[in-house]
Amino acid sequence: MLKTRVIPCLDVKDGRVVKGVQFLALRDAGDPVEAAKAYDAAGADELCFLDITASHEARGILLDVVQRTAEACFMPLTVGGGVRSVEDIRALLLAGADKVSINTAAVNNPDFVAEAAEKFGNQCIVVAIDAKRVSGPGEAPRWEIFTHGGRRATGLDAITFARTVTARGAGELLVTSMDRDGMRSGYDLGLTRAIADAVSVPVIASGGVGGLDDLVAGVAEGHASAVLAASIFHFGEATVAQAKAHMAAAGLAMRLDP
């Protein structure tokens, strides 16, 4: 049975972590490599870096961060944000990323997913789906894809889009509820479950974790294969080990460190 993965997420801007990370062992909370080393030591199954830098000039800084992290850490590393071309993907993989997350470029051109999967293999192509609930009270639930940090509506149905990019070769989907992100009220389980049940690839639940029970629900009720969280780990409210122990106690298959 496949183990459920716990994935901390670091937002990186101009080579620095944006959300504070309150690890006591960290000399510099703003350094993503130090944060990554701490999560690696804490037993995270994977780590996700999302580069939210607007400028293309900062790509060199991100590549340096990825390279230094890959040299220092054993856990798999997924990197996303601003990936627009096959060259971007190649550069990140060469720097040491294990997987690359594509967002806006996949929305603009789903065939880009096929091209990337053909060149680098399905296993390292993740499509990030940012969605908002657009159905009203009493209506059948419906979610729309948004880009540009949730600011730009696309008119695309999230479930249909998930099927499209999976058919094009995406090996994994990172599903974030824009409604729940940062709200600490739990994942949008309806969204996560609808997508997970519609595709044959692993789905990572993202957006809205406020406590450890939310992680359990993401898998047990949301049918996710992995759970991503930021704030509860960054602000020291729970450790990765506590999260895994809590999920294992709820009957989920976890990779527990001895």
Curated annotation (Swiss-Prot):
Function: IGPS catalyzes the conversion of PRFAR and glutamine to IGP, AICAR and glutamate. The HisF subunit catalyzes the cyclization activity that produces IGP and AICAR from PRFAR using the ammonia provided by the HisH subunit.
Reactions this protein catalyses: 5-[(5-phospho-1-deoxy-D-ribulos-1-ylimino)methylamino]-1-(5-phospho-beta-D-ribosyl)imidazole-4-carboxamide + L-glutamine = D-erythro-1-(imidazol-4-yl)glycerol 3-phosphate + 5-amino-1-(5-phospho-beta-D-ribosyl)imidazole-4-carboxamide + L-glutamate + H(+)
Matches recorded under Pfam families: His_biosynth
Catalytic site positions: 11, 130
Its EC number(s): 4.3.2.10
Pathway where this protein functions: Amino-acid biosynthesis; L-histidine biosynthesis; L-histidine from 5-phospho-alpha-D-ribose 1-diphosphate: step 5/9
Key words, A-Z: Amino-acid biosynthesis, Cytoplasm, Histidine biosynthesis, Lyase
GO cellular component, one term: cytoplasm
Protein name: Imidazole glycerol phosphate synthase subunit HisF
Name of the top EC class for this enzyme: lyase
Signal peptide, first to last residue: none
InterPro entries according to UniProt: Aldolase_TIM, His_biosynth, HisF, IGPS_HisA/HisF, RibuloseP-bd_barrel
Gene name of this polypeptide: hisF
Source taxon at top rank: Bacteria
Subunit structure: Heterodimer of HisH and HisF.
PANTHER family linked: IMIDAZOLE GLYCEROL PHOSPHATE SYNTHASE HISHF, IMIDAZOLE GLYCEROL PHOSPHATE SYNTHASE SUBUNIT HISF/H IGP SYNTHASE SUBUNIT HISF/H
Localization terms from the record: Cytoplasm
Gene Ontology biological process terms, A to Z: L-histidine biosynthetic process
Family: Belongs to the HisA/HisF family.
